[in-house]
């Protein structure tokens, strides 16, 4: 069975742990406890193939900048996470997270993940009656950032409602499988003159 190591990075409190807990247990965590480092594992079926998916949760706080990269070796795919209701976390994708993972794992594919879309959708409804100073990140902004940083795909999701949750991890696995297919084709290609 093929194994895939998926590391999740992003600012503190953007919903990385909720994403993993909701995906692996179908339950949404009720309280926020900052993560230092945590591991989850699941056997999943993607495109009719069993995959041992190793999920690595990381600390987003600056206090852990020096130890976080210890989880990066042999990473197959990164999920760069930001909250769609936190513009600073969105900006940190290009100023901190993409440069950090590119420095340590220059060849690993990245997916850009916008979390907490349930809150954005809720705010969109309530903004009609109240004046908010912080505008949530739109899908179009996420797509533009995805292209800007060279991520393979942009996906929005909600750990609370589980909207697009399985899709996030299926696409992470597909990113690795597709790269492995391309490498096998390159290795099998042989020209004799």
UniProtKB/Swiss-Prot annotation:
Family according to the record: Belongs to the small GTPase superfamily. Rho family.
Covalent lipid adducts (S-geranylgeranyl cysteine), residues: 190
E.C. number(s) listed in UniProt: 3.6.5.2
Domain of life per record: Eukaryota
SMART domains, A to Z: RAB, RAN, RAS, RHO
Protein name stated in the entry: Rho-related protein racB
Renumbered ranges of motif Switch 2: 57-75
Source organism of this protein record: Entamoeba histolytica (strain ATCC 30459 / HM-1:IMSS / ABRM)
Membrane topology: Lipid-anchor
Keyword Cytoplasm: yes
A single GO cellular-component term on record: cytoskeleton
Proregion positions: 191-193
């Amino acid at each position: 069975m093929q194994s895939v190591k998926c590391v999740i990075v992003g600012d503190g409190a953007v919903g990385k742990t909720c994403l993993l807990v909701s995906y692996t247990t179908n339950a949404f965590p009720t309280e926020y406890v900052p993560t230092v480092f945590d591991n989850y594992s699941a056997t999943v079926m993607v495109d009719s193939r069993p995959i041992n998916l190793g999920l690595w949760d990381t600390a987003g706080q600056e206090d852990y900048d020096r130890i976080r990269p210890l989880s990066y070796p042999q990473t197959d795919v990164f999920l760069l996470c930001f909250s769609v209701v936190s513009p600073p976390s969105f900006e940190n994708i290009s100023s901190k997270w993409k440069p950090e993972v590119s420095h340590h794992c220059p060849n690993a594919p990245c997916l850009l993940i916008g979390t907490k879309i349930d809150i954005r959708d809720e705010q969109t409804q309530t903004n009609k009656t109240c004046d908010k100073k912080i505008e949530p990140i739109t899908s179009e902004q996420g797509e533009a950032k995805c292209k800007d940083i060279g991520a393979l795909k942009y996906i929005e999701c909600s750990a609370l409602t589980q909207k697009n949750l399985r899709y996030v991890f299926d696409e992470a696995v597909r990113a690795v499988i597709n790269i492995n297919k391309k490498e096998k084709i390159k290795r099998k290609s042989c020209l004799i003159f």
